[in-house]
Design a protein with these regions (language model features):
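Acidic/histidine-rich alpha-helical segments that form the ligand environment
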Residues: 91-127, 138-147
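Short, charged, low-complexity loops and linkers
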Residues: 9-23, 91-92, 99
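Short, contiguous alpha-helical
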Residues: 2-12, 23-27, 34, 42-87, ...
Length: 175
């Protein structure tokens, strides 16, 4: 098996390097979101610009539902679990920041635990999501897109709400 030199001189196979990279990127997305949420008051977490738009709390509820459904018994069951009520994920029934963050942590713990258990020999294995076959790589990349989409929404809403009080999560613009 061909190896590549990864950061800090580690010798890894391509599959090992891929898994290490995606785990790192997902953890960065999680941390970025948490840094945005830390800047918000409880009421800001539940703010929505209109009835058709989702609050950060609802986006988090949806992400958690998706993570738990997709990554529980990942190799042996369809990623869309029969007990998942996706529509309920968009109901604003959470009232406290602690409830939101509990769901956030349940989702991420489920997802990252499953992701860390994948080995390179499983990357081309076929799994199903909504009765459609996907390789494990495709499933990971599907989630990379989905979670990044929602992380962007969360950060954008948080930045809008904080306005001039926003603390940049990356390199700030020069003023």
């Amino acid at each position: 098996m061909k190896t590549i030199t990864y950061r800090r001189g580690e010798l890894l196979s391509l599959g090992q390097a891929y898994l290490k990279a995606v785990i790192q990127r997902f953890m960065e997305a999680k941390l970025t979101t948490e840094k945005a949420i830390e800047q918000l008051s409880e009421s800001e977490l539940f703010w929505s610009p209109d009835e058709e738009s989702n609050s950060i709390a609802i986006i988090i509820k949806h992400m958690s539902g998706n993570m738990v459904s997709r990554w529980t018994q990942f190799f042996t069951t369809d990623g869309e679990k029969p007990d998942r009520n996706r529509d309920d994920e968009f109901v604003g029934d959470l009232k406290k920041k602690e409830q939101v963050m509990e769901l956030w942590n349940i989702g991420w713990n489920t997802f990252l635990s499953a992701l860390k258990d994948i080995n390179e020999d499983q990357l081309l294995k076929t799994i199903t999501i909504r009765n459609e076959p996907h390789s494990v790589i495709e499933a990971i990349e599907r989630q990379m897109y989905h979670y990044s989409y929602h992380v962007g929404q969360i950060v954008y809403i948080a930045k809008h709400l904080k306005s001039s009080d926003w603390q940049s999560l990356t390199i700030p613009r020069k003023k």
